[in-house]
UniProtKB/Swiss-Prot annotation:
Record-linked PROSITE patterns: IG_LIKE
Organism: Homo sapiens (Human)
UniProt-listed InterPro entries: Ig-like_dom (IPR007110), Ig-like_dom_sf (IPR036179), Ig-like_fold (IPR013783), Ig_sub (IPR003599), Ig_sub2 (IPR003598), IgSF_CEA-related (IPR052598)
Domain Ig-like C2-type, chain residue ranges per copy: 227-314
Protein family according to the UniProt entry: Belongs to the immunoglobulin superfamily. CEA family.
Keyword presence, Cell inner membrane: no
Stored SMART domains: IG, IGc2
Name of protein: Cell adhesion molecule CEACAM18
Disulfide pairings: C255-C296
CDD domains from the UniProt entry: Ig
Residues spanning the signal sequence: 1-30
Biased composition, class Basic and acidic residues, residue ranges: 373-384
Residues of this chain annotated as glycosylated in UniProt: N108, N112, N121, N162, N270
Length: 384
């Protein structure tokens, strides 16, 4: 980055006026002269050369006020040949216009520089003073909070400087006041209202010298959000929220959601909270007592948002109107073996599948219900 002339302080203005007067004398006489007199530590400096004649055969730059061989920094023979000298540090080169480029510039680069230009049968010399300045301390920035909740929290950032020409960057993009962002009249404070998950970084920048910019550190924001949705994926796949699986088979379920930060998972089976907190559940060998409805609940403790999704596991051909009734209370008709216990009369239902197609009850024309006898009961009655 090319550096321009200094400003503000009295001694810099005096120095600038002296340089301009010297340049005017050089211009009047048609001689080459050095125009660049200011550099910034750590940046690129161009010790600019002006009034250069045509058909230059060689540019030679020297450290100090004379062009002795021991002081040579670098020489350049157009179009491309460059020869380093004893004072070469590896940071210097000569551009097409014959100016000396130094990058990065150091404080000890301050001093006189002499250039010798050979063009045809003529050799011209010029000497100029380069002053290298150091920028102030690093630009400071502070925020009132860095851990936030989307659409709920706001953040205020302060640029710690006395300069009022401040540029604010959000996600490395220059920003200005808007419906969601406000910059104070002095430019030193940026407020982001209702932060978004896409607000990732904040930074401020000032122009310390013309075309010389200082940036603060980049502040990272942690914005919690979600869950936006929750899905319950299963293997075997579910159909309309129902997973069909055989007894003894494997069933896998996974709770999927889009959220940030760490989530908490809860599983509920037939209304009972399970002691299980992972996103994935694996039923390696499905049992009857594992049939029924499962609910995966996802909780973001930071945003305090909760979402859930249900799925039902059932056996093939299971009748949804039958399965919830695991016990039947019946009026007893007919001579069917039974016994009484503390709960009253209880039938020995011989079907191993409570939702089997085999009828357990018979209904006569009057509406009375009787138990369908087992085959062994029929044999026993026939032998009497």
């Amino acid at each position: 980055m090319d550096l321009s002339r200094p400003r503000w302080s009295l001694w810099r203005r005096v120095f600038l006026m002296a340089s301009l007067l010297a340049c005017g004398i050089c211009q009047a006489s048609g001689q080459i002269f050095i125009t660049q007199t200011l550099g910034i530590k750590g940046y690129r400096t161009v010790v600019a050369l002006d009034k250069v004649p045509e058909d230059v055969q060689e540019y030679s730059w020297y450290w100090g006020a004379n062009d002795s061989a021991g002081n040579m920094i670098i020489s350049h023979k157009p179009p491309s040949a460059q020869q380093p000298g004893p004072m070469y540090t590896g940071r210097e080169r000569v551009n097409r216009e014959g100016s000396l480029l130094i990058r990065p510039t150091a404080l000890n680069d301050t001093g006189n520089y002499t250039v010798r230009v050979v063009a045809g049968n003529e050799t011209q010399r010029a000497t100029g003073w380069l002053e290298v300045l150091e920028l102030g301390s690093n630009l400071g920035i502070s925020v009132n909070a860095s851990s936030l909740v989307e659409n709920m929290d706001s953040v205020a950032a302060d640029c710690l400087t006395n300069v009022t020409n401040i540029t604010w960057y959000v996600n490395d993009v220059p920003t200005s006041s808007s419906d969601r962002m406000t910059i104070s009249p002095d430019g030193k404070t940026l407020v982001i209202l209702r932060v978004s998950r896409y607000d990732r970084t904040i930074q401020c920048m000032i122009e310390s010298f013309p075309e010389i910019f200082q940036r603060s550190e980049r502040i990272s924001l942690t914005v919690a959000y979600g869950p936006d949705y929750v899905l319950l994926r299963s293997n075997p796949d579910d159909f309309n929220g129902i997973v069909t699986a055989e007894i003894g088979s494997q069933v896998e379920m996974e709770c999927i959601c889009y959220s940030f930060l760490d989530l908490k998972y809860h599983w509920i089976h037939n209304g009972s909270l399970l002691n299980f907190s992972d996103a994935k559940m694996n039923l390696s060998s499905l049992a009857w007592e594992q049939m029924g409805r499962y609910r995966c609940t996802v909780e973001n403790p930071v945003t305090q948002l909760i979402m859930y999704m249900d799925v039902r596991i059932q056996a093939p051909h299971e009748d949804l109107t039958c399965c919830p009734q695991r016990f039947l209370h019946l009026r007893i008709h007919g001579d069917v073996p039974h016994h009484a216990d503390s709960a009253g009369w209880r039938l020995h239902l011989w079907s191993p599948d409570p939702c089997s197609d085999q009828p357990l009850l018979n209904q006569d024309k009057s509406g009375s219900m009787s138990v369908h006898p087992r085959p062994e009961d029929k044999t026993r009655r026939a032998s009497r």
